[in-house]
Regions:
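Transmembrane alpha-helix termini and helix-breaking/packing motifs in multi-pass membrane transporters
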Residues: 152-176
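Intracellular juxtamembrane helix-capping segments at the cytosolic ends
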Residues: 117-131
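Short amphipathic helix-loop junctions that connect adjacent transmembrane helices
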Residues: 25-42, 162
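C-terminal ends and interior cores of transmembrane alpha-helices
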Residues: 78-98
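Cytoplasmic membrane-interface "Motif A"-like loop-to-helix N-cap segments
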Residues: 65-80
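Pair of pore-lining "gating" transmembrane helices in MFS-fold secondary transporters
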Residues: 2-27, 109
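Hydrophobic core of transmembrane alpha-helices in multi-pass small-molecule transporters
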Residues: 97-118
Length: 219
């Protein structure tokens, strides 16, 4: 494709979604199978995730206008990594169950909030990179990579769980972890790897003929 900045950004979005999109459904599975949480709590936590996305969608426009796409994307990576590390550490018995569920809910709300912000910020970046008169093709191209990353994230998670490749339980420093927690740690590592691809995002490192206004720089 002739539009190299858009191609690079689309590949970055694919990798980021591949690393990050499995976390939210994995939380529900972890709570049911790993923490043996009551059904009503699991449904409530899933509602909290939806609330985070709705809240993020509502506030993301103002946040992007104030801070710019660059800072929002950096905040997304930091939040994704810290949230997955927190979920990795939040095991059975680390605190009373009620507080454990509240903490997981808060982490998931923050994660979902930033996921919505990431979607809006990425769309802004994609529309800026699209050449005039070719925005529909650019949108299709970008969305193809975007949704492919999301689908493959859940597919790979399913294959890993189904294959039994991960130890069901393991210990570190006297603390026991499950294979669900191992996946959260894996997600965190993959998000950090995806951060290395920020070098191809023009909002982070502008180059060529793409000049960023206040919406993208936050200035």
């Amino acid at each position: 494709m002739a539009n190299k900045p858009l191609t690079g950004f689309s590949v970055y979005s694919f990798i980021l979604n591949l690393a990050a999109y499995g976390t939210i459904p994995m939380v529900s599975l972890y709570m049911k199978k790993g923490l043996c949480a009551p059904d009503n709590v699991i449904v409530l936590i899933s509602s909290v995730a939806l609330g985070g996305m709705l809240t993020g969608s509502f506030f993301s426009g103002g946040l992007i206008q104030r801070y710019g796409v660059k800072l929002i994307l950096l905040a997304v990576h930091i939040t994704y990594a810290l949230a997955n590390i927190a979920l990795f550490l939040l095991g059975k018995g680390c605190m009373p169950d009620t507080w454990l569920y509240i903490t997981i809910g808060a982490v998931l709300f923050a994660y979902s909030f930033m996921y919505a912000c990431s979607d809006i910020a990425s769309t802004c970046e994609m529309m800026l990179l699209a050449t005039p008169g070719n925005k529909m093709v650019a949108m299709s191209f970008y969305n193809g990579f975007n949704h492919c990353g999301r689908g493959m994230s859940r597919m790979l998670t399913s294959l890993i769980l189904g294959s039994g490749a991960l130890a069901a339980h393991w210990t570190l420093g006297g603390i026991e972890f499950s294979h669900y927690q191992t996946l959260f740690l894996t997600y965190a590592i993959c998000v950090c790897f995806a951060a290395s691809l920020l070098v191809v995002v023009p909002a982070i490192f502008p180059e060529g003929d793409y000049h960023y206004d206040a919406l993208h720089t936050g200035k």
